[in-house]
Amino acid sequence: MNSLLMITACFFLIGTVWAKEGYLVNKSTGCKYGCLLLGKNEGCDKECKAKNQGGSYGYCYAFGCWCEGLPESTPTYPLPNKSCSKK
């Protein structure tokens, strides 16, 4: 019984330690933040680490800014009920 309790506690802790990751999204258009220089990208890293995003690291992946270490409150692509509109 104690083993089951310990395993459950470990799964709970792992879930709270892992941070969110994903493509940065423009809330008004629903589109990903674009980039051209794949891999390490100063622009993506700066955007991800901005105060309003709260990420720990960003890089260019598949021509979009991918962020790691985001808080759960930061929206990522795709936004629910909003498709990318380039207007």
From Swiss-Prot:
State the family named in the UniProt similarity comment for this chain.
Answer: Belongs to the long (4 C-C) scorpion toxin superfamily. Sodium channel inhibitor family. Beta subfamily.
Q: Which residues form the signal peptide?
A: 1-19
Spell out the disulfide connections: 31-84, 35-60, 44-65, 48-67
What GO MF annotations does this protein's record show?
sodium channel inhibitor activity; toxin activity
Compartments reported by the entry? Secreted
Give coiled-coil spans as residue ranges. none
- Tissue specificity statement from the Swiss-Prot or TrEMBL entry: Expressed by the venom gland.
Principal subcellular localisation of the protein: secreted
Provide one Gene Ontology biological process annotation.
Answer: defense response
Q: Which organism is it from?
A: Centruroides suffusus
Q: Which residues cross the membrane?
A: none
CDD domains the record matches: neurotoxins_LC_scorpion (cd23106)
Where in this chain does the record put each LCN-type CS-alpha/beta domain?
A: 20-85
What does its UniProt record remark on the domains?
Answer: Has the structural arrangement of an alpha-helix connected to antiparallel beta-sheets by disulfide bonds (CS-alpha/beta).
Descriptive protein name:
Toxin Css39.8
Write one Pfam family the protein is assigned to: Toxin_3
Q: Name one GO cellular component term.
A: extracellular region
Q: Which UniProt keywords apply?
A: Cleavage on pair of basic residues, Disulfide bond, Ion channel impairing toxin, Neurotoxin, Secreted, Signal, Toxin, Voltage-gated sodium channel impairing toxin
Q: What does this protein do?
A: Beta toxins bind voltage-independently at site-4 of sodium channels (Nav) and shift the voltage of activation toward more negative potentials thereby affecting sodium channel activation and promoting spontaneous and repetitive firing. This toxin is lethal to crustaceans (freshwater crayfish (Cambarellus montezumae spp.)), it provokes a reversible paralysis to insects (crickets (Achaeta spp.)), but is not toxic to mice. At high concentrations, it does displace the (beta) mammal-specific toxin Cn2 from rat brain synaptosomes.
